[in-house]
Amino acid sequence: MRKAAAAAVAAAAAVGVALLVRRQLREAKRWGRADAVLRELEERCAAPPGRLRQVADAMAVEMHAGLASEGGSKLKMIISYVDALPSGEEKGVFYALDLGGTNFRVLRVQLGGKEGRVIKQEHDEISIPPHLMTGGSNELFDFIASSLAKFVASEGEDFHLAEGRQRELGFTFSFPVKQTSIASGTLINWTKGFSIDETVGEDVVTELTKALERQGLDMKVTALINDTIGTLAGGRYDDNDVIAAVILGTGTNAAYVERANAIPKWHDLLPKSGDMVINMEWGNFRSSHLPLTEFDQALDAESLNPGEQVYEKLISGMYLGEIVRRVLLKMAEEASLFGDEVPPKLKIPFIIRTPYMSMMHCDRSPDLRTVGAKLKDILGVQNTSLKTRRLVVDVCDIVAKRAAHLAAAGIHGILKKLGRDVPNTDKQRTVIAVDGGLYEHYTIFAECVESTLRDMLGEDVSSTIVIKLAKDGSGIGAALLAAAHSQYREAEEL
């Protein structure tokens, strides 16, 4: 009897051991598959120094091609007609209007010249009623002009408009426009939920000016710009060595100061300054040297603009979290990363926003508590292991650092085009103004951009290159450009 019982116990123990071994083998295979996905991702995203130099070289080549002729490059290299950036000498009251989405901002600033600088500024933000986004052109611009008129009416005693002068406005219009002068441009098409057919092909400055006249508001639009050029203007106002601006936020773009005689497609008279600001629209850059993965290709194919904005889809805040989601989905499907069932929410495109990715990536707690909390909040995944959380952080690290490497390579391309990527004997500073939430708030990303650029340039050159955070280009930058292109500028210079 005892022998039988002992045999039964031994058999049960053997079964238990076998089950445990099988479970451990299954677990090992699962982690092996997840690790294989991670290793392949790391390999495909790799951007060693040689490859980054090829990307920078390709950017410089495309810049040359885009300046030579319209349509000659994936980079539009748009002539902005901004031939003068703020010098710091500007004085007076100037306004800005920033229209780029469902809200718009109005801003006024009192400038006091070299000594006073920005004496005071005020702003207001107004929501656009949804029906005006798809109504008539007059209705939309009348609403904007009416809001601007109310804002002007609240102008206090701290703001001093010189006697006999017209108020002047910088207009940041973040929609596709064919610029025809510093203060005119025709709308190519609406985006971001706007759909007003009668405005397409019309000069948006003329539309705004007519609406201002209907409100009885005596105000002249002296500059039509986008947010990137505004960032360049704001950066130059603060630091005379700023030569380029880069937006690294939800989207991405770059603008820089070019010599007008180095723009073959410019057929007008050379500006007095000899300079011209170029809006690169660099998000549309592409090159065979860009490290693409299956996840990037699928994201691009399923996007609203397949084959377009490839660079932007690799480096901007709109897409980084989505790339991470796609990698984690593959791990969940092929390696049961989050258990036997794939979390339903993980199948929802763009559910992992880049700010969430940043929080997980920057988690420094020993048990990666923030990662666990975010996986629970966003995906509904309960009780993840530390090993799983580490894997998620690794995915974020690979995706974010590839983006930072490529952003740095793009900046290097601009420096190369301008001949600022080689040592100069007088140690002249070169400053790049950067704006955007991705750069401002995602610390690991920003630090990686800076360290990668330093490594690419080498010690001698990098000691003269500065990347500087420049906030609110679309607001203060527009007002500063209104001042720099004031109709009274030449009279003041006499």
UniProtKB/Swiss-Prot annotation:
Superkingdom in the source lineage: Eukaryota
Task: Give the residues the record marks as binding D-glucose.
Answer: T191, K192, N226, D227, N253, E281, E312
Taxonomically, what lineage is the organism? Eukaryota, Viridiplantae, Streptophyta, Embryophyta, Tracheophyta
Pathway(s) the chain acts in:
Carbohydrate metabolism; hexose metabolism; Carbohydrate degradation; glycolysis; D-glyceraldehyde 3-phosphate and glycerone phosphate from D-glucose: step 1/4
Q: Name one GO molecular function term.
A: fructokinase activity
A cellular-component GO term for this protein: mitochondrion
Q: Where is this region: Hexokinase large subdomain?
A: 226-472
Question: Which residues does the UniProt record annotate as the domain Hexokinase?
Answer: 32-483
**EC numbers on record:** 2.7.1.1
Q: Where does ADP bind?
A: G101, T102, N103, T250, G437
Q: Which UniProt keywords apply?
A: ATP-binding, Glycolysis, Kinase, Nucleotide-binding, Transferase
Please give the family membership noted in the entry: Belongs to the hexokinase family.
**The protein's name:** Hexokinase-2
Name its GO BP terms in alphabetical order.
glucose 6-phosphate metabolic process; glucose metabolic process; glycolytic process; intracellular glucose homeostasis
Residue ranges of region Hexokinase small subdomain?
Answer: 87-225
The protein's induction, as recorded, is: By glucose or fructose treatment in leaves.
Q: What biological function has been recorded for the protein in this entry?
A: Fructose and glucose phosphorylating enzyme.
- Tissue expression per record: Expressed in roots, leaves, flowers, immature seeds, endosperm and seed coat.
Which cysteine residues pair off into disulfide bonds?
none
Q: Which residues form a coiled coil?
A: none
InterPro entries assigned = ATPase_NBD, Hexokinase, Hexokinase_C, Hexokinase_N
Q: Gene encoding this polypeptide?
A: HXK2
Looking up SUPFAM superfamilies in the UniProt record yields: Actin-like ATPase domain
Q: Which reaction does it catalyse?
A: a D-hexose + ATP = a D-hexose 6-phosphate + ADP + H(+); D-fructose + ATP = D-fructose 6-phosphate + ADP + H(+); D-glucose + ATP = D-glucose 6-phosphate + ADP + H(+)
